[in-house]
Structures are given as C-alpha cells and as structure tokens.
C-alpha cells in the first residue's frame, strides 16, 4: 500500500456546489521554488555549532531537536545551503488541494438530505431507527485538519482545545478557525452532539474535541506542522494524564520521516492514531501515509450500498496488497478496518451542513468508535482499544467491493467495526 511522494486530504465532495474535493497532492517543489517564493526545508547537522549558526541565520519554524529544524527560504538560499557540507537540507513536502471528483452523487445526496440521522451513524450503531448517540465521555479526540468551527451549535459544547500549528515555532492557542470546511465536517462525524436537538450526532458526542489546525484555509499544509501537532497531542496525553485519539483525515503518497517519527512518539505515549486510507482505489498498493504506518489505523471507506449481505467498499477507497490477505496482522501499507465514508452528512464551516465522500469521512467514524470504547473501558491501553476495533471488525466481515472477501482482505481490512 505504498504510493510515491504526495500529501493529500482524503475527502471527495458529493456535490459540485460546495467546496472543491479534498485530495491534497504534494508539490515536489517545482512551482514553489521559482524566484523569491519561499518554501519549507528541513535542516540538520551532527555538528551542533553549525546547526546553531544555521538557526540564527535562517530562523526556526519548528525545532525537532535530534531531527533538525525547519525553516522557510527561497531557491537561492536553498541552493547555497546545500553547498554547506556540514549540513543536510531537504524540502519538506508541501500540500495542495486537488479535486478528487466532480461527479454529482445525486442518489446519495438525496438520501443524506432526507435523513436527520446520517446513514453512517445508523450503520456504525447497527440501528436503523437511532436518532441520538451517546458515549465517549472523558476521552479526547484530536482532529488534525483545516481547523474547526468551534462555534458550530453541534460542536461548541465539545471543544476543549483549539490550536493553530501552521504559524510555527509554537502553536497559537484559541486559534483554529476553519475557512475550508473539511475539519469541521470531520469533527462532526466523530463527536457532534446534536446541538439544540435539530443538528446531527457523531459517533461519540460526549468526547472532548481538540481542534488542531495543521492545514491552511485552502486545505494545504506542511508535514512539519502536522508532525508538531502529533507530538503535542502525545505530550498533552502525558501531561494531563488523559486518553487521546488522534484523527488524521489527510495522507501522503510518500512517507515523511517527520510524521513517521511523530506517530511513533505519540503511539508510544499511549495515543491511538486513526488515519484515512486514501482515495486512490481500487488499485492495489495505494494506501497513503500516515495510514500506511504500522502504528496508525488505516480506515477504508464504505458506501451505503448493500451487496452480498454487507456494505460495499467504495471504489475510490485505497487498497492494500493482495499478499497480506488473511494474515490478520498489521504490516506497513495495510488497510486495517472499514467505516462509512461515501456521502456523509455532517457539520460544515459556515455553521450549516454538507455531504462529502472520502476516506476522510470514514476515519472520524472509527475515531469516534475508539473514543466510545475507551470510555467504556478507561483502564485499557491504546493497544487494547485498537485490538477491540480489530475484533469488532472481524465480527462484521465486508464481502462487497473490489477485492473484498471473507476474512482479512486488502480492501476492507478486518471488516467494519461497529458499536454493537
């Protein structure tokens, strides 16, 4: 489930009159490197004196200690710095939105608009008549995304942290404005509480929201900002002695060492990390990072269509590798579980609601379920909760969609993890 060098947000809009679909592909540095336009670089050295001098000369965006520091510079500065044999320097992946699809999903759209309870909530609760959800109390869901509308009536009661990591050096507290929509939508699927009673419910409405803005208002961002937020969530879990589920509805076609090391750091601190599998299906070996990492749970997207007695894995949902079928073991590049991700109705940045498709939408359903499970078993570890997700998925096999089949398959993973 590997792809080659791009970072993207993994949502697709179900209707064309909303914002462009989330699919962020990495700029290899071509356009950003022209003229005096600045871009992000990672600088490191075994010689601390040289590293200190470079920090003083260029300034620091984020300091990753043993991994070096990041800063912004133009092409001329970058080329000059590369000639310094005492330093190693590389470009940090830049993210930019790319439309995943502009094909209207009229049938899904009509279904979503006609239901007060999103189909994904009914599906994950395995209850077609449910109108209100519950659970997740005492658990924090850190949504690393474009920010969140913390004044949305369905979300404002859940907000505990609101931080902007795109400014660098340190985060900006009480600043996580979402002008794009993606992050607000993701947060809603995870933990919306229905607001005044006329809104939507997420999977775990009693959970607390940590809204971490790591992507800009256009849906673009840098790997170092994401890595800094991941590490901060891990540090907060330790400092506050609390349980944290990170949701990352974003991804990369190539692995970033900064993000990989940050994921490992926070996972080892007891944080459970959920990530979108990506929207490059149905092709084999297309799982994006960080979902492809062993210490992250990659979530595939299901659509509201039943075949062979189960929901169907969406064609757009990224697939793993056929040779991992049936092993019930998580390896790099595996899809782990599945959740609703096609035509998902949820909260929007303007205070209203929108319908979007993508593995970006599947991931927060799984994150909400993880929070709900953890609240039920507060003494459990992140590894325990992950095992419970796998077990529940195993109990609810997915048999529909390209490459889906009995047991652990490379389309749906272990299956569809549900509340009951």
Swiss-Prot record:
The keyword Metal-binding applies. Residues 118-420 form the Peptidase S8 domain. One of its GO terms (cellular component) is extracellular region. Its cofactor is Ca(2+). It catalyses: Hydrolysis of proteins with broad specificity for peptide bonds, and a preference for a large uncharged residue in P1. Hydrolyzes peptide amides. Its EC number is 3.4.21.62. Residues 1-31 form the signal peptide. Ca(2+) binds at residues 115, 154. One of its GO terms (molecular function) is serine-type endopeptidase activity. InterPro entries: Peptidase_S8/S53_dom (IPR000209), Peptidase_S8/S53_dom_sf (IPR036852), Peptidase_S8_Asp-AS (IPR023827), Peptidase_S8_His-AS (IPR022398), Peptidase_S8_Ser-AS (IPR023828), Peptidase_S8_subtilisin-like (IPR050131), Peptidase_S8_subtilisin-rel (IPR015500). It holds the Pfam family Peptidase_S8. Binds 1 Ca(2+) ion per subunit. Still active at temperatures close to 0 degrees Celsius. Thermolabile. It is found in: Secreted. GO terms for biological process: proteolysis; sporulation resulting in formation of a cellular spore. The active site is at residues 145, 182, 360. Keywords: Calcium, Hydrolase, Metal-binding, Protease, Secreted, Serine protease, Signal, Sporulation, Zymogen. PROSITE patterns: SUBTILASE, SUBTILASE_ASP, SUBTILASE_HIS, SUBTILASE_SER. Residues 32-111 form a propeptide. Subtilisin is an extracellular alkaline serine protease, it catalyzes the hydrolysis of proteins and peptide amides. Secretion of subtilisin is associated with onset of sporulation, and many mutations which block sporulation at early stages affect expression levels of subtilisin. However, subtilisin is not necessary for normal sporulation. This is Subtilisin.
């Amino acid at each position: 489930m590997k792809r080659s060098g791009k970072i993207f947000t993994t949502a697709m809009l179900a209707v064309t009159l909303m914002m462009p679909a989330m699919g962020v592909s990495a700029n290899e540095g071509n356009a950003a490197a022209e003229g005096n336009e600045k871009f992000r670089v990672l600088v490191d050295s075994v010689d601390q004196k040289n590293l200190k001098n470079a920090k003083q000369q260029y300034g620091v965006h984020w300091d990753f200690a043993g991994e070096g520091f990041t800063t912004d510079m133009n092409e001329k500065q970058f080329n000059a710095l590369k000639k310094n044999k005492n330093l190693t320097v590389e470009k940090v992946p830049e993210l930019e939105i790319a439309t995943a699809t502009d094909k209207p999903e009229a049938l899904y759209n009509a279904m979503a608009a006609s239901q007060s309870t999103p189909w994904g909530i009914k599906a994950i609760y395995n209850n077609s008549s449910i109108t209100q959800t519950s659970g997740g109390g005492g658990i924090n869901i850190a949504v690393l995304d474009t920010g969140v509308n913390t004044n949305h009536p369905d979300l404002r009661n859940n907000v505990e942290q609101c931080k902007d990591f795109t400014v660098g050096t340190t985060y900006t507290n009480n600043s996580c404005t979402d002008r794009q929509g993606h992050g607000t939508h993701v947060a809603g699927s995870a933990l919306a509480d229905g607001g005044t009673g006329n809104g939507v419910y997420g999977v775990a409405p009693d959970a607390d929201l940590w809204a971490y803005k790591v992507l800009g208002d256009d849906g673009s961002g840098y790997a170092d900002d994401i890595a800094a937020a991941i590490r901060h969530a891990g540090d907060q879990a330790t400092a506050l002695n609390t349980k944290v589920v990170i949701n990352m509805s974003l991804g990369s076609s190539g692995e970033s060492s900064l993000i990989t090391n940050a994921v490992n750091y926070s996972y080892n601190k007891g944080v459970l990390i959920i990530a979108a599998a990506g929207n490059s299906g149905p092709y084999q070996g297309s799982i994006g990072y960080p979902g492809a990492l062993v210490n992250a749970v990659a979530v595939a997207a299901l659509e509201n269509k039943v075949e062979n007695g189960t929901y169907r894995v969406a064609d757009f949902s990224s697939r793993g590798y056929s040779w991992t079928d049936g092993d019930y073991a998580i390896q790099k590049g595996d899809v782990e579980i599945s959740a609703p991700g096609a035509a998902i109705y949820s909260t929007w940045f303007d205070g209203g609601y929108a319908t979007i498709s993508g593995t970006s939408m599947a991931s927060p359903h799984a994150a909400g379920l993880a929070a709900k499970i953890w609240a039920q078993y507060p003494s459990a570890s992140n590894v325990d909760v992950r095992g419970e997700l796998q077990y529940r998925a195993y109990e609810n096999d997915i048999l529909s969609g390209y490459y889906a089949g009995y047991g652990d398959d490379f389309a749906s993973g272990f299956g569809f993890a549900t509340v009951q």
